[in-house]
Regions:
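Compact, glycine-rich, soluble single-domain proteins
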Residues: 1-105
Length: 105
């Protein structure tokens, strides 16, 4: 999986973002992982809806447009949940729970 960096206004926010842009990498996502480091994230593309089945920890999710505009932030999503589709979303960032607030998003 390719690693990306996430910037906002030229400032580095997240230094290791996995790019899940194929069926299998999107399907697996964060399932069955024990944890996620705070400065890491997973970018699901294309994606407009997520679930947290098979996950062992809460996450923050950020729905993005094709132009990387933030459309919706869902904080502290617990395991075993399905979240609604976000209109016009093309990508979803999955982060450690609490990271969106720490980044000022």
């Amino acid at each position: 999986m390719a690693l990306l960096k996430v910037y906002k206004n030229g400032k580095l926010l997240l230094d290791e973002c996995e790019n899940a842009n194929h069926f299998f990498t999107r399907f697996m996502g964060l399932m069955y992982r024990r944890s996620m480091e705070e400065k890491h994230c997973l970018l699901l593309t294309p994606c407009n809806e997520i679930h947290t089945f098979g996950m062992k920890f809460d996450i923050d999710t950020i729905a993005l447009s094709k132009d990387n505009e933030i459309l919706f932030i869902d904080r502290a999503v617990p395991p075993k949940k399905v979240r609604k589709k976000v209109k016009d979303a093309y990508k979803v960032l999955e982060l450690c729970s609490g990271t969106a607030d720490k980044l000022g998003l």
